[in-house]
Regions:
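C-terminal catalytic lobe of FAD-dependent flavoproteins
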Residues: 282, 286-359
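N-terminal Rossmann-like FAD-binding beta1-loop-alpha1 element of flavoenzymes
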Residues: 3-29
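Dinucleotide-binding Rossmann-like beta1-alpha1 core, especially the glycine-rich loop
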Residues: 46-128
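Short hydrophobic core segments
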Residues: 6-8, 183-195, 331
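Active-site substrate-recognition segment that forms the wall
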Residues: 16-23, 46, 85-88, 194-311
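Helical element adjacent to the flavin cofactor pocket in flavoenzyme catalytic cores
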Residues: 143-180, 187, 191, 197
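Glycine-rich FAD pyrophosphate-binding loop
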Residues: 22-42
Length: 359
C-alpha cells in the first residue's frame, strides 16, 4: 500500500507539492481550507529574477534563478497530464523602467549587480520600450528589456495544478487543520505561509501585507502591455502585469502585526493608482475590477524555510514575494526529502534552506 501524505496549505506551493508527490506514488491529501489559495490569488504571477535582483540579497537571487529554470518542465508536465495550460503564460519578457534621475541611478545599480550572475538586461530606447508597452507615458526615462522573464496568470496556474492533482489522485479537504498530530498520515508537509507558526513551534516567519489591483480593459481602451512592466517610479516600486482581459497592478509591501488585518489600506491603493496611471496614462481608461490584499510570509534572511523538522514533518514556508516563481523548485526539494529511506538529497539548497536555521 502507498504511504500516506498530508499537505497542509492549498496555495501554489502546497498544491504543486501535492501534485508532484502523488505522481511519485504517495497517497496524498491536500488540506486547503481556503479553496482560493489565499496569497496565490492576490499575486502578480511574475517569473522574474532581474526585477528581484537587489544588492545584498544574492542568495535569494541565486535561488530565484535556479527556480526559474524549472518552469519549462513544470508546464510540460502539466501538458502531459492532460491539463490545459494555454491560459497560464501571459507574458514572455520583462521591461524594467525608471522615471527620474534617482530612479535611473537605482536601476543602473541593479543592472550592474545582475551582471555578476550572468543576467544582462538589454538597454532599450524609447521606441523599443513603447513596442513592448504602448501605453508608456513620456516620463519613462530609461528602460531595460529582460528576454525570457515573463509571467503567469496566478489563478489559472492554481486551477491547472489543482486539476492535475485531482487527476493524479490527490484528495482535497477543506476543513481547517489545527494540529498536525491529528492527521492520519505517514508524512506531513506544512505549506501554510504566514500561519505556519500556528502548527509548528519555532518556525520564524513574519507576515508582510501587500495590496494589488486588477483592472479590466473596456473595448475602447488601449491594450495591455505585451511584457511585464516593472518600474522604479519616483522612489517607489510598481509593476503592471498583463492579463487577457486587463492588467494586474502591484504591489505595496509592509510589515503587519495583525494577520487578521487583510483589508486593503486606502493609502496603499492610492499609491498604486497614482504610480500606475503616471507610468501608463492609458490605464486611466480601465475599470477597477478588484482591489485585493494578502499576506506574504517572509524570513530574516529572505530565503524560504524548506526542509525537515522531524522524521514525520517537512516545512515549506517563507517564500515572501517569490512564492509562485520558486514553487517548482520548492516542490522538487520537498518531494525528494519525503522519502526517508533514500540517501540524502544532493541539492545544495537542502542545507541553505534548512528551516532549523531560524530556530
Amino acid at each position: 500500500m502507498s504511504a500516506r501524505l498530508a499537505v497542509v496549505g492549498g496555495g501554489v506551493v502546497g498544491s504543486i507539492i501535492a501534485w508532484r508527490a502523488a505522481r511519485n506514488g504517495w497517497r496524498t491529501t491536500l488540506h486547503a481550507p481556503d479553496i482560493t489559495g489565499a496569497g496565490t490569488s492576490v499575486a502578480g504571477g511574475m517569473l522574474g529574477c532581474a526585477g528581484e535582483g537587489r544588492p545584498g540579497e544574492d542568495a535569494l537571487l541565486e535561488f530565484a534563478l535556479a527556480a526559474r529554470d524549472r518552469w519549462p518542465a513544470l508546464l510540460a508536465d502539466l501538458d502531459a497530464s492532460g491539463v490545459d495550460t494555454a491560459d497560464i503564460m501571459v507574458a514572455a519578457d520583462t521591461l524594467l523602467i525608471a522615471a527620474d534621475s534617482s530612479d535611473v541611478g537605482h536601476l543602473r545599480a541593479v543592472v550592474d549587480h545582475l551582471a555578476a550572475f550572468d543576467v544582462r538586461p538589454e538597454s532599450v530606447d524609447r521606441d523599443r520600450m513603447r513596442s513592448a508597452a504602448a501605453m508608456l507615458g513620456s516620463s519613462a526615462r530609461r528602460g531595460y528589456l529582460v528576454t525570457g522573464e515573463g509571467a503567469v496568470d496566478n489563478r489559472a496556474l492554481l486551477a491547472a495544478v489543482r486539476s492535475g492533482a485531482r487527476s493524479a489522485g490527490v484528495t482535497l479537504e477543506t476543513e481547517k487543520v489545527c494540529r498536525i498530530g491529528d492527521l492520519d498520515a505517514d508524512q506531513v508537509v506544512v505549506a501554510t505561509g504566514s500561519w505556519a507558526p500556528d502548527l509548528i513551534e519555532g518556525v520564524s516567519v513574519t507576515a508582510e501585507k501587500g495590496e494589488i489591483l486588477r483592472l479590466s480593459r473596456p473595448p475602447t481602451a488601449p491594450p495591455p502591455p505585451d511584457a511585464v512592466v516593472r518600474a522604479r517610479w519616483r522612489g517607489r516600486s510598481v509593476y503592471v502585469v498583463p492579463r487577457r482581459d486587463g492588467v494586474v497592478v502591484g504591489a505595496t509591501q509592509y510589515e503587519t502585526g495583525d494577520r487578521d488585518d487583510t483589508a486593503p489600506r486606502v493609502g496603499g491603493v492610492s499609491d498604486l493608482l497614482i504610480d500606475a496611471t503616471e507610468l501608463m496614462p492609458g490605464l486611466a481608461e480601465y475599470r477597477v475590477a478588484e482591489i485585493g490584499s494578502g499576506l506574504r510570509p517572509t524570513t530574516a534572511d529572505g530565503l524560504p524555510l524548506v526542509g525537515r523538522r522531524d522524521r514525520r514533518t517537512v516545512v515549506a514556508v517563507g517564500h515572501g514575494r517569490n512564492g509562485i516563481l520558486t514553487a517548482p523548485l520548492t516542490a522538487e526539494i520537498v518531494v525528494d526529502l519525503l522519502d526517508v529511506s533514500s540517501p540524502p538529497s544532493a541539492s545544495p539548497w537542502v542545507a541553505r534552506l534548512d528551516p532549523r536555521r531560524s530556530a
